[in-house]
């Protein structure tokens, strides 16, 4: 009997912020992932890198201040670095948790490049905030380098483009490992954004929305289910208002209607809903669960969360 294929998208809550936090958080996350594996799902994992890529970007910028002759580190390289060290902790935590349960399955992290459109309007309207708060002097220095900054509370922040994912370069490798019943960590942080130039791939100065990348990954893998872990238990209507209403189920048509009404926050729930709609499409089989990871890492699919179907 063919196993059901599931893609699990981990939010930054499932990873922590600092290195010690990440070590502990990945242990809890591994328990939830192991539950799916024990129930005989074919599992592929993707994850956020919000705090981590910001720390890497800041660290590399500070390094360049000490050594001006050093070439500034591109965003695409920062993305690759974040995939490496988050994947390292994740795959080891999952491997250990599986062995504790008497299950042996190889766990691998694939450095993943995601193709974006050079004409994506996001390149003309950068919106994704990265890195620490900058002083006015530092902000001016960034602008002289050709980077975009925006004034925020307490100072300035650098902003970069967040283009939509078009294709995944390493999808065949991910499929091969997954079909061999191995656990795969891929498309970390939305993937390394790249532009196609003939036979070459060139890193783009951008970050990809990780929920949309998770949806694209699930689509290309022809997965049965996409699980998006976030900071809230359910998708809610009128979120944060006195008449807030959590939803246990939602259809694609209902999701589209709620989007038109402006129910979902941009950069928050909206990309998750967009990912769900894109992944499910016209399929009567595919489904998306949006929910929160329990603090103890216990089973995340016991009737909690919001299930989205056609």
Indicate residue ranges for each PLM-predicted region.
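C-terminal catalytic "cap/lid" subdomain
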Residues: 2-310
């Amino acid at each position: 009997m063919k196993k059901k294929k599931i893609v699990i998208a981990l939010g930054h809550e499932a990873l922590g912020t600092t290195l010690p936090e990440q070590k502990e958080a990945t242990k809890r996350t591994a328990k939830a992932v192991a539950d799916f594996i024990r129930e005989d799902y074919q599992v592929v994992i993707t994850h956020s890198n919000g705090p981590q890529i910001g720390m890497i970007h800041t660290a590399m910028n500070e390094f360049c201040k000490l050594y001006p002759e050093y070439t500034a580190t591109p965003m695409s390289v920062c993305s690759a670095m974040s995939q490496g060290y988050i994947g390292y902790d994740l795959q080891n935590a999952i491997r250990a948790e599986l062995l504790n349960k008497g299950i042996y399955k190889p766990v691998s992290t694939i450095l993943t490049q995601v193709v974006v459109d050079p004409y994506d309007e996001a390149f003309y309207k950068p919106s994704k905030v990265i890195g620490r708060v900058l002083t006015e002097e530092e902000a001016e220095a960034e602008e002289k380098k050709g980077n975009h900054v925006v004034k925020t509370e307490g100072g300035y922040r650098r902003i970069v483009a967040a283009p939509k994912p078009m294709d995944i370069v390493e999808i065949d490798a991910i499929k091969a490992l997954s079909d061999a019943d191995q656990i795969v960590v891929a498309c970390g942080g939305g993937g390394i954004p790249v532009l196609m130039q003939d036979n070459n791939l060139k890193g783009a100065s951008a970050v990809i929305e990780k929920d949309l990348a998770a949806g694209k990954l699930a689509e290309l893998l022809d997965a049965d289910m996409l699980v998006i872990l976030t900071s809230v238990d359910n998708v809610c209507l009128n979120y944060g208002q006195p008449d807030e209403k959590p939803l246990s189920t939602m259809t694609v048509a209902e999701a589209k209607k709620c989007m038109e009404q402006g129910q979902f926050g941009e950069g928050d729930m909206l990309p998750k809903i967009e990912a769900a709609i894109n992944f499910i499409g016209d399929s009567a089989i595919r489904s998306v669960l949006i929910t929160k990871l329990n603090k103890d890492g216990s089973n995340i699919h016991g009737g909690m969360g919001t299930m989205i179907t056609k």
